[in-house]
Amino acid sequence: MHELIREAVDNPGTAWEIIKMDRDVTEVVDAVSDLSREDKIKLGATFKRFPLGCDLTELIVGTCASDLEKIDLMGNCMLSDTIGATIHVCAYAFADIAESYGMRPVELMREVRETTEVPLDLDHFGRYGPMRFPRSITGCGGQCYLEGPPFEGCPRERIHARLLDREKEGLSDREEWVELSSSVAVNLTPVQGAETHAAPLEEAEEVLELARKHGKGVEAIMFVGDGYDDLISGFEAGLEMGVDVFVLEGGPFNLAGDRLDAFAGAVAAARILTPGKIVATNGAYEDECRIGLRAGLNAIITGFPKNHHGYMCGYTPGTARRGKFGLPRVMKIMREEVESGLTPVPIQKAQLEALAAAVKVSGTENVYPRTLGYTYVGDAHWACLPSTPLYERVEVKRDVNALVKMAEDGDIHGRVAIFGARFVSWVIADKLDGLVDEFVIVDRDPWVEQVTVDNLRSELRTDVHPGNSDDEGAYSSADSSIVSTTIPQISAKISGKFRDTVTLV
């Protein structure tokens, strides 16, 4: 594994071979640790490429705090929704705000769900429902982030201050909280020695099982810690539990001798190991955010003033304190560190709509966590988006079942060109396997085309050929053509150029 990872720094083909293999956590962390800082960055960036990882960069936004007025919470949620940012639900704060207005906590969650359409990411949720804390915790000024490492245990004994009797009062609403959410966070830090910081692992496992019962994605929060043993224990616990996404927390919880080397290495290792292809951070100083983004971070959880994520990402010891409005700062950092490619940085609602359309076209039963060939079809987004009003709103012209019907009726036949070689093309080829004579896969990105052809050849009986990034050649050689993209502008451009192509949106 050491040699393969060293080679994968500059060779995406080797990275693709690693994806095909069983990956041992200790071997991966050990091999990544041996790399220079620049090679860790390059390795992580390689594993962010399709289909090795999710290649999007996004904001997740904490909109709440226990002492916010309801009007401010709702406005924060509406603003996040408008810019297409997932809303990070700190359940204890939602509960505190709701009760101050004479509402049951879940009623406020319902109202936010009815008012917005982006994913809701549920955190601080325990075996009874929303965790509940005293004012000394909910109003904490961020002492650990303000002072910086080393973290030696929460000075307020956070997890031991839970108000369990109040939590139990909401038990009857527990399932509805999860039903209304798109994803649920669990905390792995107790296995990394942070017993004062998070609930016991057994409770996290209960929450994970509840999330799975309702078909939700699960993300695992873990510390960078010492940058080696703590990473191994966190990754192993998460993979054993079956989580989808790793969320890495640095800041005061990055105790490594070289903080930035450790953060870059943690991101790169997570990129190789995470099943759902997404790596995020919920807490990182500005320099960690920057190096993490260069090393392949997909998401940064930030927040509005008073929300603790508002100061946990993008600031420094001495400036990271409650009251900071981290959202615009983190957006600026993202745009300085990540080049826009096919999508803007950070992604916006139009990209969520295209993703939702891709899932709807493919069918939820055909995408992540389903695999095809060597890897998953899609990423954790594809499991979370169906639990949103945005998914319900998005319309498609036809789905893969309609394509199968067209093939059975002879309207799609012979040699079939598929324009676009990303995940939807995988599902199309899989469903038309045996119904047509052969496929030619064409994509303007030669790497995307090459890896898709390799993956489909491993799975299908029907012959699969590369189109060599030549749209006109692929079209002229085919009897039928399908545009697989769900980005409306690109679909219209291709179908306008090539007559009689079948489109999905």
Swiss-Prot record:
Q: Which InterPro entries match?
A: HcgG-like
Q: Which domain of life is it from?
A: Archaea
Q: Where is this region: Disordered?
A: 461-480
Query: In which family does this protein belong, per the annotation?
Result: To M.jannaschii MJ0787.
Q: What is this protein called?
A: Uncharacterized protein MTH_1137
Q: Which organism is it from?
A: Methanothermobacter thermautotrophicus (strain ATCC 29096 / DSM 1053 / JCM 10044 / NBRC 100330 / Delta H)
